[in-house]
Amino acid sequence: MLSDCEFDAARDTIRRALHEDLRYGLDITTQATVPAGTVVTGSMVPREPGVIAGVDVALLVLDEVFGVDGYRVLYRVEDGARLQSGQPLLTVQAAARGLLTAERTMLNLVCHMSGIATVTVAWVDAVRGTKAKIRDTRKTLPGLRALQKYAVRVGGGVNHRLGLGDTALIKDNHVAAVGSVVDALRAVRAAAPELPCEVEVDSLEQLDAMLAEEPELILLDNFPVWQTQVAVQRRDIRAPTVLLESSGGLSLENAAIYAGTGVDYLAVGALTHSVRILDIGLDL
């Protein structure tokens, strides 16, 4: 279910999207071809199997176009439903002109969100039987982060930080600026002792230094499988409360191998930065 903040973000996104479509005038094609007052029944229907996310977002689009009482919902599925090609996810009755005006914004958002949910399910299924969780990143499309991260949750994934201020994540450029990974961690802890702190390492030497400091999480950047196994062994012996996350070089084909090493998370930027949409159409 969308949180209040996600609802607000969805409304903002929808208003911008509708403005993009209508800033130069009304839908001239629809105005010319569809008689005023025509009422139709329309269904959003996937053209391929997938996991649905964004049904409430589609309804928010209709709210913007019609008002909350300007259309009737005849059928809907809940987010997370796994549908086959041809199975409707949403059926509404509404004025044809308004529905055609809303069509592209509804489809753009629901196709994108359902694509994210579908690929996230594939990753979650790939690591099933291990303790590893699939986690997203900040590699999101500008303006769509809240909806993309919601879709990851629909698919069974876990959200990483929403912005730069809710968790500290020390990366290579921070280390370069301050001099060492230990100095970077200590600087962050001094500045924001109340925040959880995560540290990216790219070698076993950096890992050893961080295990001595015990941050909340250590991100293993582009570690091959053997190095990841060593990292888990050292963590288990020296700092068992520290979480480990694998990042870089991950694929659906090797996800189970990395998850089987004992890491806690797999960081998957591809969930959001380059996901393929789920093909969905609106049928009247």
Swiss-Prot record:
Database matches in SUPFAM superfamilies: Nicotinate/Quinolinate PRTase C-terminal domain-like, Nicotinate/Quinolinate PRTase N-terminal domain-like
One Pfam short name: QRPTase_C
Keyword annotations of the record: Glycosyltransferase, Pyridine nucleotide biosynthesis, Transferase
Catalysed reaction equations from the record: nicotinate beta-D-ribonucleotide + CO2 + diphosphate = quinolinate + 5-phospho-alpha-D-ribose 1-diphosphate + 2 H(+)
GO cellular component, one term: cytoplasm
Gene3D superfamilies assigned: Aldolase class I (3.20.20.70), Quinolinate phosphoribosyl transferase, N-terminal domain (3.90.1170.20)
Organism: Mycobacterium leprae (strain TN)
Database matches in InterPro entries: Aldolase_TIM (IPR013785), NadC (IPR004393), NadC/ModD (IPR027277), Nicotinate_pribotase-like_C (IPR036068), Quinolinate_PRibosylTase_N_sf (IPR037128), Quinolinate_PRibosylTrfase_C (IPR002638), Quinolinate_PRibosylTrfase_N (IPR022412)
Single Gene Ontology MF annotation: nicotinate-nucleotide diphosphorylase (carboxylating) activity
Protein name, per record: Nicotinate-nucleotide pyrophosphorylase [carboxylating]
Function: Involved in the catabolism of quinolinic acid (QA).
Ligand binding (substrate): 104, 137-139, 161, 171, 200, 221, 247-249, 268-270
Membrane-spanning intervals of the chain: none
E.C. number(s) listed in UniProt: 2.4.2.19
Subunit structure: Hexamer formed by 3 homodimers.
Biological process, per Gene Ontology: NAD biosynthetic process; quinolinate catabolic process
Pathway this chain belongs to: Cofactor biosynthesis; NAD(+) biosynthesis; nicotinate D-ribonucleotide from quinolinate: step 1/1
Family according to the record: Belongs to the NadC/ModD family.
